[in-house]
Amino acid sequence: MGFVKVVKNKAYFKRYQVKFRRRREGKTDYYARKRLVIQDKNKYNTPKYRMIVRVTNRDIICQIAYARIEGDMIVCAAYAHELPKYGVKVGLTNYAAAYCTGLLLARRLLNRFGMDKIYEGQVEVTGDEYNVESIDGQPGAFTCYLDAGLARTTTGNKVFGALKGAVDGGLSIPHSTKRFPGYDSESKEFNAEVHRKHIMGQNVADYMRYLMEEDEDAYKKQFSQYIKNSVTPDMMEEMYKKAHAAIRENPVYEKKPKKEVKKKRWNRPKMSLAQKKDRVAQKKASFLRAQERAAES
């Protein structure tokens, strides 16, 4: 069929149907969402959990959610801006930070359900493929599915860093190694050591060393926060190892204390009935006293 020009006449506008709001805004891929949300009909009211990963300019958001008619219900959430608490003060949007955020989400969720001692996950970071399996006589492994949204799911995307962190943390998420850094599409082989380097921030450390030698000014400009926090390339691996251990030790979210706000009143408050009656009585008494004084004089 050749090119057909759309004739925008009365019939076109009369029959025009707008797309969903979040599709118009370019926020939701409804083709993917439909498949992620719909549960098997023989599972009745069992929720189908999704691991949602979104990368913004300054943060990485990881959530476990399930869909309801009223809207999505968030079961648990973890953010990259929480990582300074665990010792990672810089590079909060790189691959290593995505891994830490995914790990934090998994440990926090399992801790909430009392399964953190049953499913420890992979404590030693190898970068190799690892899958969580249910243990006999214990609650089954928590299963969810990756929701990458509209992110381009290319090999090495940070979304898969968060996925790997969650899997190593003890969640059962179906995946393969094809999208992890270290996978070669030509030879169809996966190099786990390359992946481990990314998890430990060694790709960033190598670039820091390269810039230090080649262009000092560019290094100072690009890694100003690293310099400010005294983070050197040699410290990176140890920093992330300590962060992983700290996350496993205490993944619980601590609520910030609510600020007490003293309300200022800009107008006079309304008087009660008793106050109004008292005011009238005072005015009457004052008026009568004035009348008496006038009569005496």
Swiss-Prot record:
Its main location: cytoplasm. There is a cross-link at K220 (Glycyl lysine isopeptide (Lys-Gly) (interchain with G-Cter in SUMO2)). InterPro entries: Rbsml_uL18_euk (IPR005485), Ribosomal_uL18_C_euk (IPR025607). GO terms for biological process: cytoplasmic translation; negative regulation of protein neddylation; negative regulation of ubiquitin protein ligase activity; negative regulation of ubiquitin-dependent protein catabolic process; positive regulation of gene expression; positive regulation of translation; protein stabilization; regulation of signal transduction by p53 class mediator. One of its GO terms (cellular component) is cytoplasm. It is found in: Cytoplasm; Nucleus, Nucleolus. The modification N6-acetyllysine is found at K5, K48, K220. The modification Phosphoserine is found at S185, S272. Residues 258-268 have a biased composition (Basic residues). There is a cross-link at K220 (Glycyl lysine isopeptide (Lys-Gly) (interchain with G-Cter in SUMO1)). CDD domains: Ribosomal_L18_L5e (cd00432). It comes from the Eukaryota. Keywords: Acetylation, Cytoplasm, Diamond-Blackfan anemia, Disease variant, Isopeptide bond, Nucleus, Phosphoprotein, Ribonucleoprotein, Ribosomal protein, RNA-binding, rRNA-binding, Ubl conjugation. The keyword Ribosomal protein applies. The modification Phosphothreonine is found at T232. The modification N-acetylglycine is found at G2. Residues 253-297 are annotated as: Disordered. GO terms for molecular function: 5S rRNA binding; mRNA 3'-UTR binding; mRNA 5'-UTR binding; RNA binding; structural constituent of ribosome; ubiquitin ligase inhibitor activity; ubiquitin protein ligase binding. It is linked to Diamond-Blackfan anemia 6: A form of Diamond-Blackfan anemia, a congenital non-regenerative hypoplastic anemia that usually presents early in infancy. Diamond-Blackfan anemia is characterized by a moderate to severe macrocytic anemia, erythroblastopenia, and an increased risk of malignancy. 30 to 40% of Diamond-Blackfan anemia patients present with short stature and congenital anomalies, the most frequent being craniofacial (Pierre-Robin syndrome and cleft palate), thumb and urogenital anomalies. HAMAP family: Ribosomal_uL18_A (MF_01337_A). Component of the ribosome, a large ribonucleoprotein complex responsible for the synthesis of proteins in the cell. The small ribosomal subunit (SSU) binds messenger RNAs (mRNAs) and translates the encoded message by selecting cognate aminoacyl-transfer RNA (tRNA) molecules. The large subunit (LSU) contains the ribosomal catalytic site termed the peptidyl transferase center (PTC), which catalyzes the formation of peptide bonds, thereby polymerizing the amino acids delivered by tRNAs into a polypeptide chain. Component of the large ribosomal subunit (LSU). Part of the 5S RNP complex, which is a LSU subcomplex composed of the 5S RNA, RPL5 and RPL11. Component of a hexameric 5S RNP precursor complex, composed of 5S RNA, RRS1, RPF2/BXDC1, RPL5, RPL11 and HEATR3; this complex acts as a precursor for ribosome assembly. Interacts with isoform 1 of NVL in an ATP-dependent manner. Interacts with RRP1B. Interacts with IPO5, IPO7 and KPNB1; these interactions may be involved in RPL5 nuclear import for the assembly of ribosomal subunits. Belongs to the universal ribosomal protein uL18 family. This is Large ribosomal subunit protein uL18. It comes from Homo sapiens.
